[in-house]
From Swiss-Prot:
One of its GO terms (biological process) is ribosomal large subunit assembly. The lineage of its organism: Bacteria, Pseudomonadati, Pseudomonadota, Gammaproteobacteria, Vibrionales. Belongs to the bacterial ribosomal protein bL20 family. This is Large ribosomal subunit protein bL20. Keywords: Ribonucleoprotein, Ribosomal protein, RNA-binding, rRNA-binding. One of its GO terms (molecular function) is structural constituent of ribosome. Gene3D superfamilies: 6.10.160.10, Ribosomal protein L20 (1.10.1900.20). HAMAP family: Ribosomal_bL20 (MF_00382). Transmembrane segments: none annotated. It comes from the Bacteria. The gene is rplT. NCBIfam families: rplT_bact. GO terms for cellular component: ribonucleoprotein complex; ribosome. Binds directly to 23S ribosomal RNA and is necessary for the in vitro assembly process of the 50S ribosomal subunit. It is not involved in the protein synthesizing functions of that subunit.
Length: 117
């Protein structure tokens, strides 16, 4: 069986990992073994964070809608229920945006939700 030399592939793999670890502190950006562990862990954190980001933004939108609807005399759950009964289909992201940047329009939505209840 002939001898297989894998120096080129190993060098390329090491360079790839070290390039991904650029900007890390100390040995994490210079030593392949440590950099590989750091890059692997960073990938796990990134995978997890892509999922938690969705939950966190939804929580933020709900908190903003709740605060704005309470200023207009209605709780969040009753406000959402009123919108559903009034057949107004605006998602929470847009509702939160309206609540922050256009308080008059949000007040109109709250009034429509109140009349539908």
């Amino acid at each position: 069986m002939p001898r297989v030399k894998r120096g080129v592939q190993a060098r390329a793999r090491h360079k790839k990992v070290l390039k991904q670890a650029k900007g890390y502190y100390g040995a994490r950006s210079r030593v392949y073994r440590v950099a590989f562990q750091a890059v692997t862990k960073a990938g796990q954190y990134a995978y997890r964070a892509r999922r938690t980001k969705k939950r966190q933004f939804r929580q933020l939108w709900i908190a903003r809608i709740n605060a704005a609807s309470r200023q207009n005399g209605l709780s969040y759950s009753r406000f959402i229920n009123g919108l559903k009964k009034a057949s107004i289909e605006i998602d929470r992201k847009i509702l939160a945006d309206i609540a922050v940047f256009d308080k008059a329009a949000f007040a109109v939505l709250v009034e429509k939700a109140k009349t539908a209840l």
